[in-house]
Swiss-Prot record:
GO CC term (a single one): DNA-directed RNA polymerase complex
Highest taxon of the lineage: Bacteria
Keyword Mitochondrion found: no
Enzyme Commission (EC) number: 2.7.7.6
Reaction(s) the record says it catalyses: RNA(n) + a ribonucleoside 5'-triphosphate = RNA(n+1) + diphosphate
Comment, domains: The N-terminal domain is essential for RNAP assembly and basal transcription, whereas the C-terminal domain is involved in interaction with transcriptional regulators and with upstream promoter elements.
Protein name: DNA-directed RNA polymerase subunit alpha 1
Gene Ontology biological process terms, A to Z: DNA-templated transcription
Lineage per the UniProt record: Bacteria, Pseudomonadati, Pseudomonadota, Gammaproteobacteria, Thiotrichales
Length: 323
């Protein structure tokens, strides 16, 4: 028997262990270094429940309704209940779509459900049986629902919704596709196995959800990798290599840009504010799919952070990422 005292090499593996039905799954990560599975499990759980993006109805315009406290003849639910039902509709959009209007128009009696929406290519209603309203007698019922991609801020969305037309009603959107997360740790002797229970709304695959959570968490902590404590050993004064302004280390994903703008910058490998400020307006306009509206949005974000375009920072990425 070989007496090898070198540290065991861990070859990580993530896989779907079990499909429990009703969009509930078990995802297994192994092997995990001894003592780290609980830390990893807690981190994955918190990110899954707080930080994944998704699509949600953000506003609705119902025919013959002026405000959310209205009632409709021959409709069992009031408008507040209808809006609450619309919030529960699970919508999956192609990555190229970040906002669109969905139309619903029926003339019947009985239950109006999410399956009555007219969908186009790249749009899928997951829970078609989700009730929206109940028509007690045959009548016309129509509405326009605006769907947007976003990410919750805190528990639910805090993103303002523009009400442009008479009768527009804001919906308290819940963008997060994850509904429940739990985890369990198994001891393998010299390593651990982490099993994550994930319940989604059906718009995201479980492995993709866990992978995105890990990627997002890594992005958030990566900015601290280049931090160092001064050689005098004082613990209360943490310095950043090359005295970079900390605001420049802010990840682009934290700027609450629209999905289109964020995707354009990500495709250009612009990860931090420090990357972004080094571009000029003309350089940004050359980025594929980044138009004038996105440029104005980016400029406003920079103004809000007391920054501007066209700033030169020598070797910024190398200094930040230690390359």
């Amino acid at each position: 028997m070989s007496n090898n005292n070198s540290k065991q090499e861990f070859v990580p593996n993530i896989q779907l262990k079990e499909d429990l039905g009703a969009f509930s799954y078990k995802v297994q990560l192994s092997p995990v270094e001894k003592g780290m599975a609980h830390i990893l499990g807690n981190s994955i759980r918190r990110v899954l429940l707080s930080s994944l993006s998704g699509a949600s109805i953000i506003k609705v315009n119902i025919a013959n309704v002026l405000h959310e406290y209205s009632t409709l003849e021959d409709v069992k639910e009031d408008v507040v209940e209808i809006v609450s039902n619309l919030k529960k509709v699970a919508i999956k959009l192609d990555t190229a779509i970040d906002r669109l209007d969905l139309e619903l128009s029926v003339n019947k009696s009985g239950v109006v459900s999410a399956g009555d929406f007219k969908t186009t290519q790249g749009v899928e209603i997951i829970n078609k049986d989700q009730p929206i309203a109940t028509l007690t007698n045959q009548r016309a019922f129509s509405l326009t629902a605006t769907v947007s991609v976003g990410r919750n801020v805190g528990i639910l969305s805090a993103i303002p919704t523009e009400l442009e037309r008479v009768g527009d009603i804001a919906v308290d959107a819940d963008f997060n596709p994850i509904k429940r997360v739990a985890f369990e740790v198994f001891d393998n002797g010299d390593s651990e196995t982490l099993e994550v229970f994930v319940k989604t709304n059906g718009t995201i695959e479980p492995l993709a959800a866990v992978t995105k959570a890990l990627e997002y968490f890594c992005e958030q902590i990566s900015v601290f990798v280049s931090l160092r404590v001064p050689s005098n050993g004082k613990t209360g004064d943490v310095l950043i290599d090359s005295n970079i302004d900390p605001i420049l280390l802010k990840p682009i994903d934290d700027l609450e840009l629209t999905v289109r703008s964020s995707n354009c910058l990500r495709a250009e490998n612009i990860k931090y504010l420090g990357d972004l400020v080094q571009y000029s307006e003309s350089q940004l306009m050359k980025i594929p799919n980044l138009g004038k509206k996105s440029l104005n949005e980016i400029k406003q974000i920079l103004i809000d952070n007391n920054l501007s375009l066209g700033v030169q920072i020598d070797n910024f990425r190398e200094l930040v990422e230690g390359k």
